[in-house]
């Protein structure tokens, strides 16, 4: 049972929409939060925002991102070669990091209106009156948005609060038409959680085999409009994103290395994806992180500052809007080094907000204490408390899917899969879990195809290699995103089955995969027959003839093998047999056996 106690408010007022300072990316269709029909705003006048900067924008701001990254990486390498940035000494300093993660929930409805939360629709096509803060409109909490948020909190071992409330966080910016964001500052729906990071998660060596990171709280909040800046200093706003449901996950400052911080964000993303709580990961913009960084001298004992109940810390700075795992790690490294350099020079660290640019070597100041915003948090008078029943929590706990740690152990230890540690980790992290689902489908189909071969199935590792490396290589080469329909699981299973039965060679299997990947609609069996890919083994006499020919052409190498014992050169002869013979019919193992027999026998 989930219910919300609604507060009373006067009747709706009728006002004309006056959108000041914004230009809608497209005319939008209003979708009311009340059942009063759909109104078309497509004829509404467009209003533009023209903000002039004090200084002209340089052309470098419009350089393609790929080129910028290449240039920045090149400059970074050059600086290292010149020795202009000697590495800081960190042994005498303790780094402390806390992380705030914002994740888009996977829901059909927005948080406070019945408008669709679809991601890729036409700009400004899913907008309710409340989303654009039309005077008189009220928020209407959608209980369905709480379900993925609860799954996320339970997966991170949080205590679910039976009663939670919403607050207003006041600030003025173009992407927030109401002048405030609705969040859960004082009474969040989940508190006191934790996650466990292990060695395979990529934690720092000094953290040993594992480290536990506390979760202070998880709170629900509404997203803001999507803003696009044009070269003319005009901003286009897409209000589709307003009131999409987010959760903010706040960790305790218990992280002491950049690598472990990145591993923490990576692990939280994997947890959210495993329980179906989020739309996409960091790669697609569905998750972003802010990090709080402080350092203190180990020899001087505890610092003077406190953060989320943890005392004895140094003065912290916050780095906003990090959008990749690498950005999290690199930004923390840069800020750690900056703070150490300032303190060693006799300076002090200011409690400020800083930014980070991908490929940069240092953080940049955004605003200091004097520029900090007073958000004037206050309870939202239009929203009553959210009451969560025990029945809902119990039902979600019973239906909880496997979490990343359990998935990892299953992929590594289950005889059905037997993946390496690296492959298991990669499989879990890729493509929001879709690659893992595809892999499991291929394995299940292959088991069905090979019931006649052996009671002990051992093809899981081979399937992992094909899914991650062969198919993954084709995706990388073609710069295409993951799509399980491009090579159906049935087709890949049939290719691997033919290869394991030695009915086709490895090169033929790769050719088959490439043809299916490129859109060949024929069945795998039909392609094999049409393209004459079925393996026909050479006879012993044919192997001997080929071996004798390559030996006759290379007598010096034969002598080196016989007289000097350079057996490694036999592999070169195998390659020559494949070159002069039919590569699709040559089995390397048989070719090597014949070569050893002919070369070494004559030497005995």
Curated annotation (Swiss-Prot):
Biological process, per Gene Ontology: glutaminyl-tRNAGln biosynthesis via transamidation; mitochondrial translation
Signal sequence span is none
Which Pfam family, giving just one, matches this sequence? GatB_Yqey
The record's annotation in InterPro entries points to: Asn/Gln-tRNA_amidoTrfase_suB/E, Asn/Gln-tRNA_Trfase_suB/E_cat, Asn/Gln_amidotransferase, Asn/Gln_tRNA_amidoTrase-B-like, GatB, GatB_Yqey_C_2, Gln-tRNA_amidoTrfase_suB_CS, Gln_synth/guanido_kin_cat_dom
Q: Where is the composition biased (Polar residues)?
A: 33-46
Q: What is its main location?
A: mitochondrion
* Catalytic EC class: ligase
What the record says about family reads:
Belongs to the GatB/GatE family. GatB subfamily.
**Subunit arrangement?**
Subunit of the heterotrimeric GatCAB amidotransferase (AdT) complex, composed of A, B and C subunits.
What is the name listed in the Swiss-Prot or TrEMBL entry for this protein? Glutamyl-tRNA(Gln) amidotransferase subunit B, mitochondrial
Q: Which species is this record about? A: Blastomyces gilchristii (strain SLH14081) (Blastomyces dermatitidis)
Lineage at the top is: Eukaryota, Fungi, Dikarya, Ascomycota, Pezizomycotina
């Amino acid at each position: 049972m989930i219910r919300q106690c609604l507060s009373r408010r006067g009747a709706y007022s009728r006002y004309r929409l006056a959108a000041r300072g914004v230009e809608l990316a497209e005319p939008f269709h209003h979708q009311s939060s009340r059942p009063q029909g759909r109104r078309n705003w497509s004829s509404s006048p467009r209003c533009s925002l023209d903000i002039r900067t004090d200084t002209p924008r340089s052309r470098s701001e419009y350089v393609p991102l790929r080129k910028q990254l290449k240039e920045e990486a090149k400059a970074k390498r050059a600086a290292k070669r010149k020795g202009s940035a000697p590495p800081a000494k960190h042994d005498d300093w303790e780094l402390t990091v806390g992380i705030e993660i914002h994740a888009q929930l996977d829901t059909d409805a927005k948080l406070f209106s019945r408008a669709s939360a679809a991601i890729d629709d036409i700009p400004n096509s899913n907008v309710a009156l409340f989303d654009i803060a039309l005077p008189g409109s009220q928020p209407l909490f959608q209980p369905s948005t709480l379900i993925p948020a609860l799954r996320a909190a339970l997966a991170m071992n949080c205590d679910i609060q039976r009663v939670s409330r919403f607050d207003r966080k006041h600030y003025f910016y173009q992407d927030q038409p109401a002048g405030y964001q609705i969040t859960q500052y004082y009474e969040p729906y989940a508190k006191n959680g934790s996650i466990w990071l292990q060695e395979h998660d990529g934690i720092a060596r000094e953290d040993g085999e594992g480290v536990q990171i506390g979760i202070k709280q998880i709170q629900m909040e509404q997203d803001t409009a999507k803003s696009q800046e044009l070269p003319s200093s005009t901003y286009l706003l897409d209000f589709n994103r307003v009131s999409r449901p987010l959760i903010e996950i706040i960790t305790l400052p218990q992280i002491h290395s950049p690598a472990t911080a990145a591993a923490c964000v990576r692990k939280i993303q994997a947890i959210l994806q495993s329980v179906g709580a989020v739309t996409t990961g960091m790669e697609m913009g569905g998750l972003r992180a802010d990090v709080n960084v402080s350092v203190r001298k180990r020899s001087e004992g505890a610092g003077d500052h406190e953060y989320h109940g943890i005392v004895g810390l140094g003065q912290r700075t916050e780095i906003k809007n990090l959008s990749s795992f690498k950005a999290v790690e690199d930004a923390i490294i840069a800020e750690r080094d900056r703070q150490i350099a300032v303190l060693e020079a006799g300076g002090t660290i200011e409690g400020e907000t800083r930014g980070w640019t991908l490929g940069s070597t240092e953080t940049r100041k955004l605003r200091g204490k004097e520029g900090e915003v007073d958000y004037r948090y206050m309870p939202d008078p239009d929203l009553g408390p959210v009451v969560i029943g025990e029945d809902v929590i119990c039902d979600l706990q019973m239906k909880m899917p496997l979490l990343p740690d359990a998935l990892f152990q299953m992929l590594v230890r289950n005889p059905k899969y037997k993946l390496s540690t690296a492959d298991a980790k990669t499989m879990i992290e890729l493509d929001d879990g879709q690659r893992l689902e595809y892999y499991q489908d291929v394995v299940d189909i292959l088991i069905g195809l090979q019931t006649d071969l052996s009671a002990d199935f051992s093809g899981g590792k081979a399937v992992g290699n094909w899914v991650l490396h062969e198919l993954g290589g084709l995706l990388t080469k073609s710069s295409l995103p993951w799509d399980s329909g491009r090579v159906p699981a049935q087709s890949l299973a049939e290719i691997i089955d033919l290869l394991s039965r030695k009915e086709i060679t490895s090169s033929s299997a790769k050719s088959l995969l490439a043809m299916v990947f490129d859109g060949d609609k024929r069945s795998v069996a039909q392609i094999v027959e049409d393209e004459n890919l079925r393996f026909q083994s050479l006879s012993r006499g044919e192997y001997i003839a080929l071996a004798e020919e390559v030996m006759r052409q290379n007598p010096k190498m034969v002598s080196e093998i016989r007289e000097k014992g350079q057996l490694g050169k036999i592999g070169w002869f195998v390659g020559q047999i494949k070159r002069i013979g039919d590569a699709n019919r040559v089995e390397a193992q048989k070719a090597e056996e014949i070569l050893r027999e002919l070369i070494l026998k004559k030497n005995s």
